[in-house]
Amino acid sequence: MKVAPLSVVTLEYTVTDEHGEVIDTTVGKEPLVYLHGTRYLVSGLEAELEGRSVGEAFDVTLTPEQAYGQYDENLVQEVPGELFDGMEVSEGDTFVAETDDGHRPVTVIEVSEEFVKVDGNHPLAGVTLGFKVEIKDVRAATAEELAHGHVHGAGGCGHDHGHDHDHDHGHEHGGYCGGGHHGHDHGHDHGDDHGHGGCCGGGGCGAKGHQH
């Protein structure tokens, strides 16, 4: 069976940045399992996987446009600290903010007495990414998986989208990083929920969660 829309695909991968530094890998961990064609992965990686078969391995370099877009200075904004309702806020914290375009993940990059500066760019915006991928399994999705829009079972990318190794430290990264008015969402977390599948998993370096 080939990789096709609504097939369940199991991947092993390693992701590197422009300098060859490893950003994330599943080697030695659980592989990534996801429902293909649901925009879970960034567009460039999903396009490369389309039509491939179990056992195929490949390397691909994705431009920012194929991954998380170019870095947009307009997505860096100062918001009044009072919007956080007295919550303790530190640099590196990530919040799901309410904007004119809906809920958007933002990362705190600076805290002053009156303002909090947040960055709505994905942490990998503007970065060219190298993927080394091997397809371990491809199967048809179950009726339940199709109904829910995600994979069930071990390694699945369904309920726990905290695969962001990354850079969001287990906060609720999901959705486009937009501008507009930044409110706040109390789903803020200081824990490190890296999980497996950081780069290809929800919001991580292959995920479509922050896709531009």
Swiss-Prot record:
Residues 76-119 are annotated as: IF-chaperone. Residues 1-94 form the PPIase FKBP-type domain. Its EC number is 5.2.1.8. Coiled coil: none annotated. It comes from the Bacteria. GO terms for biological process: protein refolding. Keywords: Chaperone, Cytoplasm, Isomerase, Metal-binding, Nickel, Rotamase. Pfam families: FKBP_C. Its main location: cytoplasm. It is found in: Cytoplasm. InterPro entries: PPIase_dom_sf (IPR046357), PPIase_FKBP_dom (IPR001179), SlpA/SlyD-like_ins_sf (IPR048261). GO terms for cellular component: cytoplasm. GO terms for molecular function: metal ion binding; peptidyl-prolyl cis-trans isomerase activity. SUPFAM superfamilies: FKBP-like. It is an enzyme of class 5 (isomerase). Belongs to the FKBP-type PPIase family. This is FKBP-type peptidyl-prolyl cis-trans isomerase SlyD. It comes from Aeromonas hydrophila. The gene is slyD.
